[in-house]
């Protein structure tokens, strides 16, 4: 939607037009889809190894989203499984020398807060220890009505953190723009 300008609700209706527009973009986009909890980090690593053998080296990997991956090793507590998944994704980033991005949700205390901090990250706080960079997007009910919100740099291993940015956010077109310098 953010590439073609078609609203998310219209994507299925304009598949042919969208396919043509995407073909004109430089580079290669490879999308691999798995059912929830059917793929693990080993599945992702195996796919990346196959691409590497074909001469395709990823420049960027997006996992949507890590909390829904199947753990390589079953553990008693979900939080330790999640920590392991995030550690494995970090290892993939190192081994393939490219960034790996994923998303996570907040716990209930993160609903409708003005700024989401690492304290509100769902299920396993240890995910935060593994990550090099964490940002959050928060939107109150009023923000949702006004297509606004806040972006907070919660962690930045290699630079400044703690900055809050006002953003424009139109979910229908996946349009997000930073509106100012940090507060």
Predicted regions and their residues:
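Cytosolic-facing regulatory segments adjacent to core modules
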Residues: 1-57, 71, 164-167
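Phosphate/oxyanion-binding loops and surfaces in catalytic or ligand/nucleic-acid-binding neighborhoods
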Residues: 2, 6, 134, 156-160
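Generic secondary-structure boundary/loop-capping signal
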Residues: 5, 115-119, 166, 173
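Short, surface-exposed, polar/charged, turn-prone segments marking secondary-structure boundaries
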Residues: 11-16, 58-59, 89-91, 128-131, ...
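Solvent-exposed, flexible loop/coil residues
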Residues: 12-15, 73, 122-125, 171-173
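Intrinsically disordered, low-complexity boundary segments flanking structured domains
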Residues: 13-23, 121-123, 152-156
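P-loop NTPase motor core
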Residues: 33-152, 158
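P-loop/Walker A phosphate-binding loop and immediately adjacent motor/lid segment at beta-alpha junctions
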Residues: 142-183
């Amino acid at each position: 939607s953010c590439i073609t300008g078609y609203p998310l609700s219209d994507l299925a209706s304009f598949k042919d037009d969208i396919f043509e527009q995407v073909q004109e973009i430089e580079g290669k986009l490879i999308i691999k889809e798995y059912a929830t909890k059917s793929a693990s980090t080993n599945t992702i690593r195996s796919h990346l190894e196959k691409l590497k053998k074909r001469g395709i080296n990823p420049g960027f990997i997006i996992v949507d989203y890590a909390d829904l991956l199947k753990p390589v090793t079953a553990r008693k507590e979900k939080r330790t499984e999640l920590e392991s998944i995030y550690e494995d994704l970090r290892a993939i980033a190192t081994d393939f020398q490219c960034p790996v991005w994923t998303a996570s949700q907040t716990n209930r205390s993160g609903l409708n807060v003005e700024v989401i901090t690492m304290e509100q990250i769902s299920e396993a706080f240890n995910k935060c220890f593994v990550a090099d960079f964490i940002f959050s997007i928060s939107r109150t009910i009023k923000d949702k009505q006004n297509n606004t919100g806040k972006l907070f740099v919660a962690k930045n291993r290699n630079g400044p953190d703690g900055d809050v940015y006002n953003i424009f956010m139109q979910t229908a077109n996946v349009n997000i723009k930073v509106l100012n310098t940090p507060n």
